[in-house]
């Protein structure tokens, strides 16, 4: 997955110079990272779990009892040493390296692999550690065509405030599966009843490696479709979303193609939806399908 992302990073550099528009710009923007690039590999035991900047690596020299440096980067042994990672992250947060989110995430070398440690969500981009999330396409069949529920992110959100979002989306916290996370987030974000949430169908995975202001985001998105009854109306429960609107899917298609109204990674999940719904076809669909493939 990350080798593919590095290849797309080269295209992203070229696209930036040309001022590329349309759907491809979203895919390339989310795959602008070159790995390891100027970063150092971060390992737990013998497994590469992340990539850190030279600045963060210097800060980590304050924990020689846990962190070891060699020609290949830096590493932390498993067991009690890996368990110390959460405390190290908290100290770094207090020193201003990143914002503490008070939500633990599992640390894995690859999706589906064993949990090697846990670390606060706020530290993930700083360490370049893989994060997993869920995104739900809340779809409605109406006489005039397919519609999609669209949420607007709250203005106080640190990440992409006021942008448009899915009806349900969120990170997979430590100890939960994507399906369990979907049910949890569905209730919290949209008042989605459990009896509806269980009908969601997983339709794929999308991975990317992206350099952003907060650091290196290596994300794997678990994508779901849920066909909702016409009489269901989502309502915000946790102040993360301020309102929901039901849009014709064609309107969503045009907004993604022509604007930056949606949160950066939501665009990728929607592009996949447009392909599956036949709104993007031909060579463009094939290019996008291959670029989005997380395998």
What are these regions (language model features)?
Residues 246:
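Short aromatic/basic micro-patch
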Residues 1-163, 170-187, 192-235, 241, ...:
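N-terminal leader/linker segments that precede catalytic domains of diphosphate-processing enzymes
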């Amino acid at each position: 997955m990350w080798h593919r992302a590095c290849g797309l990073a080269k295209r992203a550099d070229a696209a930036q110079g040309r001022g590329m528009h349309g759907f491809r710009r979203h895919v390339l923007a989310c795959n602008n990272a070159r790995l390891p690039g100027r970063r150092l590999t971060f390992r737990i035991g013998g497994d590469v779990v992340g990539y850190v900047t030279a600045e963060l690596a210097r800060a980590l020299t304050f924990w020689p009892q846990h962190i070891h440096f060699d020609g290949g980067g830096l590493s932390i042994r498993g067991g009690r040493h890996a368990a110390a990672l959460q405390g190290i992250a908290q100290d770094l947060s207090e020193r201003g390296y990143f914002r503490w989110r008070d939500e633990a995430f599992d640390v894995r070398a690859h999706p589906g692999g064993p949990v090697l440690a846990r670390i606060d969500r706020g530290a993930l981009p700083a360490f370049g550690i893989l994060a997993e999330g869920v995104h739900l396409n809340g779809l409605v069949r109406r006489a005039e065509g397919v519609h999609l529920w669209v949420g607007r992110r709250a203005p106080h959100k640190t990440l992409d405030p006021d942008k448009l979002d899915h009806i349900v989306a969120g990170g997979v916290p430590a100890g939960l599966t994507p399906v369990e996370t979907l049910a949890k987030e569905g209730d919290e974000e949209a008042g989605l009843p459990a009896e509806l949430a269980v009908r969601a169908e997983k339709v794929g995975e999308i991975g990317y490696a992206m350099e952003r202001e907060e650091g290196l985001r290596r994300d794997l998105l678990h994508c779901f479709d849920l066909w909702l009854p016409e009489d269901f109306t989502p309502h915000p429960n946790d102040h993360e979303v301020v309102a929901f609107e039901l849009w014709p899917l064609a309107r969503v298609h045009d907004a993604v193609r022509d604007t930056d109204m949606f949160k950066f990674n939501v665009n990728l999940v929607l592009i996949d939806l447009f392909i599956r719904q036949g709104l993007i076809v031909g060579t463009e669909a094939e290019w996008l399908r291959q670029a989005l493939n997380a395998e």
